[in-house]
UniProtKB/Swiss-Prot annotation:
GO process terms (BP): cytoplasmic translation
Name of the protein described by the UniProt record: Large ribosomal subunit protein uL6
Any Pfam family: Ribosomal_L6
Keywords: Ribonucleoprotein, Ribosomal protein, RNA-binding, rRNA-binding
PROSITE patterns to which the protein is assigned, alphabetical: RIBOSOMAL_L6_1 (PS00525)
Keyword Phosphoprotein: no
Presence of the UniProt keyword Plastid in the record: no
GO cellular component, one term: cytosolic large ribosomal subunit
Taxonomic lineage of the native organism: Bacteria, Pseudomonadati, Pseudomonadota, Gammaproteobacteria, Enterobacterales
């Protein structure tokens, strides 16, 4: 039995929730997010809170209810406060710049890398070696950050590459003669 699913998701003022079968739409000041939930989950909206429980006939009902609760809580936080993800570029000549609706990266390749940003995600570069991603969809921000990091992952000898701001890169010792 899921302990996560037992806690209700409190809906703050200024947030609209629409339940249409298993499709839930949440609107707030930062935009609108929609998610389709698993059929094993039953969602009820009452007293500015969403409560979750399993449907009869499903073995994994409580597990799916806990997952649904965590996802919808992230959606509520996203449309009210939003999410940010910071990336750092470590290496000589590694630079980032915002070019329209894309992030331009100079990562030591023979060509510059342009990564388009999906709708709902904004990026800014406080310095040439920092990228800050902002948006309402937690999953989409994480995916864009992972895509940017995948162009040049931190290598284990000098630590050069694109890394998350809170990431600790374990470095190896060089080969001894």
């Amino acid at each position: 039995m899921s302990r996560v699913a037992k806690a209700p998701v409190v809906i703050p003022a200024g947030v609209d929730v629409k339940i249409d079968g298993q499709v839930i739409t949440i609107k707030g000041k930062n935009g609108e997010l929609t998610r389709t939930l698993n059929n094993a989950v039953e969602v009820k909206h009452a007293d500015n809170a969403l409560t979750f429980g399993p449907r009869d006939g499903f073995v994994d009902g409580w597990a799916q209810a806990g997952t649904a609760r965590a996802l919808l809580n992230s959606m509520v936080v996203g449309v009210t406060e939003g999410f940010t993800k910071k990336l750092q570029l470590v290496g000589v000549g590694y630079r980032a710049a915002i070019k329209g609706n894309a992030v331009g990266l100079s990562l030591g390749f023979s060509h510059p890398v342009e990564h388009p940003l999906p709708a709902g995600i904004t990026a800014e570069c406080p310095t040439q070696t920092e990228i800050v991603l902002k948006g309402a969809d937690k999953q989409l921000i994480g995916q864009v950050a992972a895509d940017l990091r995948a162009y040049r992952r931190p290598e284990p000898y000098k630590g050069k590459g694109v890394r998350y701001a809170d990431e600790v890169v374990r470095t190896k010792e060089a080969k001894k003669k």
